[in-house]
Amino acid sequence: MLSQLIERSTQYVREASLEEQNRIMPLIDFGPYVNQEPGAHERIIQQLRAACESTGFFQIVNSPISPDVVKNAFRASKQFFELPFDEKLTLSKDMFSNRGYELMEDFVLEGEEDSSSPLEISGIDFEAGSYPGEAPLPPSSIGYVLPPSSLANGEGSSMFDADMTTSNAVAHGDESISNEFRESFYFGNDNLSKDRLLRPFQGPNKWPSTAGSSFRKALVKYHDQMLAFANHVMSLLAESLELSPDAFDEFCSDPTTSIRLLRYPSSPNRLGVQEHTDADALTLMSQDNVKGLEILDPVSNCFLSVSPAPGALIANLGDIMAILTNNRYKSSMHRVCNNSGSDRYTIPFFLQGNIDYVVAPLPGLGPSTAEPIAVEDLLRDHFQNSYTSHTTSLEVA
């Protein structure tokens, strides 16, 4: 019974056929466009429009991102995950800035955690950017039980629901079983102003002291190249909507960004990431050659396991883009399951936009069916849901 709780549903997942993969995640060759070949610009616009109106997923080959920059970023990623566990824990994710190390792991028994692990969350004040009391924010050791008393006593903000007793976990008697199995390291723009450093979902970054300067330089260069390319893709997306190329410029000014180094240990029938949509406008993901991505197909209504082209960037649109385009462009459900027998490494870049930008359909795309929402509020809601929506509680006799 217990093992069934952590297995992915195989009833609604299968391998995508070549035709299905081309439909739900088409390949777009940027080479002719980068080389300014005749007709390439118009062709890219048409291909982007078709992909974004379908699932919002597409593959990019021959992008202007330097292969050496990507290679060095993956080298840094593997270097980080090979650090001693205790050292990684010293960089545990700060839940206000969304920076640092996060672990989603197997279950542990309540009451048997190491006494040095700070498990209780007494509240987080998002508005003030501070934490109640003097205790440090706990590491994101998902699978550890968060005592109900620490969440229901009214202290701090209401970021977490009062009845939430586990985070991304399945409660079974005195056990807590993680629904997800991965470890990750979050970082973002390394050159933010003092004012930006005080805002949610932004720096300062947490760099490991023993990794050396080359580690930081490799990841900063990766971030900067991905940001520049993401901004260019946004201008192409604006054109694909028959808008001015600068239609997204205000949204993209001084943007909130996030990058995650991700390692998914091989775990048959165990999800590395639960089904979800991204909160951002645009995600660009580099990956190794180990497959694991599953996309919800709107035609068959089942998850299809896809096999991205070697060296391709996986691009997908998030919830912010769906709102900006009045749902003309899609933010699709997806998840990860690595049953390859090898670790899977990916490095997604998230373009979340200016933290103060009010998200609503762009002019010319029709009236909004929902209330406009600031990027900061949308990200906060998404962040909260990520700690509650995948929690399963069981009544045990």
From Swiss-Prot:
Q: Where is the Fe2OG dioxygenase domain?
A: 255-353
Alphabetized Pfam families for the sequence:
2OG-FeII_Oxy, DIOX_N
Kindly indicate whether the keyword Iron belongs to this entry.
yes
Q: Which GO terms describe its biological process?
A: small molecule biosynthetic process
MF GO annotations: 2-oxoglutarate-dependent dioxygenase activity; L-ascorbic acid binding
Instruction: Give the keywords, sorted.
Output: Iron, Oxidoreductase, Vitamin C
Q: Does the keyword Transcription regulation apply?
A: no
Recorded hits in InterPro entries, A to Z, give: DIOX_N, IPNS-like_FE2OG_OXY, IPNS-like_sf, Iron_ascorbate_oxido_reductase, Oxoglu/Fe-dep_dioxygenase_dom
Look up the record and report any one GO term of the cellular component aspect.
Answer: cytosol
Per the record, the similarity remark reads: Belongs to the iron/ascorbate-dependent oxidoreductase family.
Official protein name in the record: Sexual differentiation process protein isp7
